[in-house]
Amino acid sequence: MSLSGASDKTSDSPDVFQIKIGFIGAGNMAFGVAQGIIASGKVPPSNIIISAPSMNNLPRFKEKGVSVTHSNHEVVGGSRLIFLAVKPHIIPQVLKEISQEVTKEHIIVSMAAGITIATLEELLPAGTHVIRIMPNLPCMLLEGALLLSCGSHAGEQEETLLKTLLGPCGLVEFGPESWIDAHVGLSGSGVAFVYVFAEALADGAVKMGMPSTLARRIAAQTILGAGVLLRDSGKLPAELKAEVCTPGGTTIHGIHALEKGGFRAAAIGAVEAASERARELGNKQKKN
């Protein structure tokens, strides 16, 4: 088996350009991450291969110049960096299928919620470089938030490689695995929470007489603008909020209504509930 780019030099070097990358699974998260890697300019699309059991999601990858296959074995045999982008309950089945072909030259990156590094390392050959990564849906637009955590045999070199390749996907951060479940609630599920808020904002404007189509467009732009300002200003959310709240003005009256409705507690509770569910899924996989 030839694993081009299998050198220990994983920094921004010609070796990165030569690395072979594989995806097992062809869903939205795989597509977003693959787009980010291509956008990095570090790896040509021809160095990427993706497998899926059907052709349903593969055409969009082919349009990007990525090789496609129905064989997971082909992905493992022709790649050094392999992303596991299948549903959590399928992970054990996939690893059982490919584990005999995985070597210490491979880097295995799991994108599955709830599947711990310990579980991955148990199902793979001893010494395998394992990393957990939790992206979110905006990775498809290269505006994602990704948290990565390294296993016991992965370290600075693998971190450098992934940060180089995934930077265009959006914000890339590293942390202990204990933060992964919180990240699922904050950013993975949090995207849907923001959509609920956007819908509610638009509904409020409709109640006050604005056409629904216009209200949805303005709600989306309002959230986008507020997010960019929060990200780029360096200010705390409370500071930016205070800048909008003039004494006796419209905004402070609206915030009072949110507080009376338990908005802040509901948001905290939503992140907690999603995080706990991610932890439960992980515990179920351990028992299985």
Swiss-Prot record:
Keywords: Amino-acid biosynthesis, Cytoplasm, NADP, Oxidoreductase, Proline biosynthesis
Catalyses which reaction(s): L-proline + NADP(+) = (S)-1-pyrroline-5-carboxylate + NADPH + 2 H(+); L-proline + NAD(+) = (S)-1-pyrroline-5-carboxylate + NADH + 2 H(+)
PROSITE patterns: P5CR
GO annotation (BP), single: L-proline biosynthetic process
InterPro entries assigned: 6-PGluconate_DH-like_C_sf, NAD(P)-bd_dom_sf, P5C_Rdtase_cat_N, P5CR-like_CS, P5CR_dimer, Pyrroline-COOH_reductase
GO cellular component: cytosol
Cell compartments where the protein resides: Cytoplasm
Alphabetical list of SUPFAM superfamilies matching this protein: 6-phosphogluconate dehydrogenase C-terminal domain-like (SSF48179), NAD(P)-binding Rossmann-fold domains (SSF51735)
Pathway the protein contributes to: Amino-acid biosynthesis; L-proline biosynthesis; L-proline from L-glutamate 5-semialdehyde: step 1/1
Pfam families: F420_oxidored (PF03807), P5CR_dimer (PF14748)
EC numbers for this chain: 1.5.1.2
Family label: Belongs to the pyrroline-5-carboxylate reductase family.
NCBIfam families: proC
Name of this chain's protein: Pyrroline-5-carboxylate reductase 3
Gene giving rise to this polypeptide: pycr3
